């Protein structure tokens, strides 16, 4: 049986990266919330 998690740095960046967050209103809210909370990393490394 194939496992469900098949890691890819490129897909990760495209879906969860900074630029994709900034591209939508919801994404910007995510960043704002993480800034307000004081997260060291706003998006995936």
From Swiss-Prot:
* GO BP annotations, alphabetical order: translation
Among Pfam families, the record links this protein to: Ribosomal_L34 (PF00468)
The answer to keyword S-adenosyl-L-methionine applying to this record is: no
Query: Which Gene Ontology MF annotations are present?
Result: structural constituent of ribosome
- Keywords for this protein: Ribonucleoprotein, Ribosomal protein
Q: Which InterPro entries match?
A: Ribosomal_bL34, Ribosomal_bL34_CS
Q: What is any one of the record's Gene Ontology cellular component terms?
A: ribonucleoprotein complex
To which protein family does this belong?
Belongs to the bacterial ribosomal protein bL34 family.
This protein's name = Large ribosomal subunit protein bL34
Say which species the protein is native to: Tolumonas auensis (strain DSM 9187 / NBRC 110442 / TA 4)
């Amino acid at each position: 049986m194939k496992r469900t998690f098949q890691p890819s740095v490129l897909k990760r960046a495209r879906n969860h990266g900074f630029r994709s967050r900034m591209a939508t209103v919801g994404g910007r809210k995510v960043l704002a919330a993480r800034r307000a909370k004081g997260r060291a990393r706003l998006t995936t490394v």
